[in-house]
Amino acid sequence: MRGDNTGVGKEPAVTERPAIKGYLYVLGSILLVTLAQLAMKWGVMQLPAWQASLDIMLAHPVPLLVITAGVGCYALSLLCWLAALHFTPLNIAYPLLSTSYALVYLLAVSIPSFAEPLEPGKAVGVIFILLGAVLVGIKPVGRKRNAH
């Protein structure tokens, strides 16, 4: 049935390559959604008082451009996420997406223009998020993980 071009009845080959590709797409989605959050935060911080007025936005084209780029990053993140779901089990990919919360917090407290305080309770929360993502991503000893 190799010559059949319909694809009916064929099982996808399970190899390490799709699993790696899936993790790369998850990583792309995480990085893009993080960039989107930071770009939109920076953009709205540059506007006088938050008003959804076209006049205010047109008077500040750079923040508007950065906000638009942030929305574009969300769109690209969605494309990466859809690709990730093709190659990665949902019960692995979705918890890994939570690392974006930790990454946004860590970058927001690290970038001086955001002036976000580093708070001990939140830092512990970030550690728990990252630990949870690692625990979900660990392959149990003696068990194989399917690519789909």
UniProtKB/Swiss-Prot annotation:
Keywords assigned: Cell inner membrane, Cell membrane, Lipid A biosynthesis, Lipid biosynthesis, Lipid metabolism, Lipopolysaccharide biosynthesis, Membrane, Transmembrane, Transmembrane helix, Transport
Domain of life: Bacteria
Classification via Gene3D superfamilies: 1.10.3730.20
Pathway assignment: Bacterial outer membrane biogenesis; lipopolysaccharide biosynthesis
An annotated Gene Ontology molecular function: carbohydrate derivative transmembrane transporter activity
GO cellular component terms given for this protein: plasma membrane
UniProt protein name: Probable 4-amino-4-deoxy-L-arabinose-phosphoundecaprenol flippase subunit ArnF
Keyword Nucleotide-binding carried by entry: no
Quaternary structure and interacting proteins, as annotated: Heterodimer of ArnE and ArnF.
NCBIfam families tied to this protein: PRK02971.1-2
Function: Translocates 4-amino-4-deoxy-L-arabinose-phosphoundecaprenol (alpha-L-Ara4N-phosphoundecaprenol) from the cytoplasmic to the periplasmic side of the inner membrane.
Cytoplasmic side: 1-23, 85-91, 139-148
